[in-house]
Every structure is written in C-alpha cells, then in structure tokens.
Amino acid sequence: MMLGMVLMISPAVAADSLPPALQAKVEQYKKKMAEWAADPAIVAAVKEANARGSLAGMSNSKWLEVDEKSPTSQAFTTSKAGLIIKKWEEDKQINKLVVRDEKGNLVAASTKPLLYNNAIRPVYINAMKGEPWAAGNIAPDPTTQVKSVQASAPIMDGGKVIGVVHAGITTE
C-alpha cells in the first residue's frame, strides 16, 4: 500500500522538477505563446484549416515519407501563418514552433515536424482544455532533438478552442 502511494505521488513531484530559472523561462514562453495564439492571421489560418479538413489521405506514417523540401511540406512553412511563426521562431530560446487545428493536424510550422497529427500527445491534449500548458520535464524535442520543455497554448475563436500553438523551449 505504501509503495502504491509513492507511485501515485511521484508524477506530481516530477511535474515540479524543472530548475527555478528554467521554470520561469517556461512560464514566460507560455504567456508569449498565448499572445501568438491570438494573432489574427494565426486564428484565420486555423479557422480555414478546420473548415477545409486535413490533407486527403495524410497520416503520420505517410508524413514521415514526405521530404522536407517537397511542395507538400513547404506549404506549411511558406503560408502566411508559416512565415509568421518562422519569424517568431527566430527567437533562439525555442527550437520549433507549430500550429495545429482542432483535430491536431498540421496548419503551419517553422520547420517540418515529425508528426502530421499529434492529437494524442500531451502538448495538444492539454492546450485543447483552454489554458497554456508545459511539460514538467526536459527531453529531446521529437523533431529537432534539442533538449527542450514542450509547451503549448490554445488558439481561441469566440471563446472556443479551435487549435493549438506549441513549441519546444530550449533548455540550454
């Protein structure tokens, strides 16, 4: 019984395990991402993506086969929203910035992300609850392999969550 209690407590302890300076940085970027999520061009891109739906036949396994320089991949980084987030990602404290629609599908990105859809990932699930979120641990970013803390913020329209902006916050 005591072991069970320790195991139940341990995830909460892990969530508070970031060094204070890094935790402050993460909180700063959660606020910044909430501002970015409210950018009218980002909101418009997500609304359009939600109305249009995902790329026909695209899945995460097919996305892995898409070359980073292909027109399909480049469409996400060179769109109006893609160019905006590429500009924001020039901030070297983040190593990736991605916009997702209401189903977790890719809308725009600063670089080709590993996944086309991340609807089952905590970075998406938690922001879809309507509040900025950040992981409580440091791990290599799945796309960039840079040590990061994953963070996200909801994209809102009329009080409804319509998508997510997420980033890898560089830890070094």
Tell me the role of every PLM-derived stretch.
Residues 145-154:
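A short beta-strand signature within small-molecule sensing/ligand-binding domains used
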Residues 70-84, 111-140:
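Extracytoplasmic/periplasmic sensor domains and loops in membrane signaling proteins
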Residues 8-14:
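Sec/Tat signal peptide C-region and signal peptidase I cleavage site
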Residues 167-172:
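Helix-start (N-cap) segments at beta->loop->alpha junctions
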Residues 14-69, 91-93, 133:
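Juxtamembrane extracytoplasmic/periplasmic/luminal helical "stalk" adjacent to the first N-terminal
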Residues 96-102:
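Short hydrophobic alpha-helical segments used for membrane anchoring or interfacial signaling
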Residues 141, 155-157:
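Sensor-regulatory modules in signal-transduction proteins
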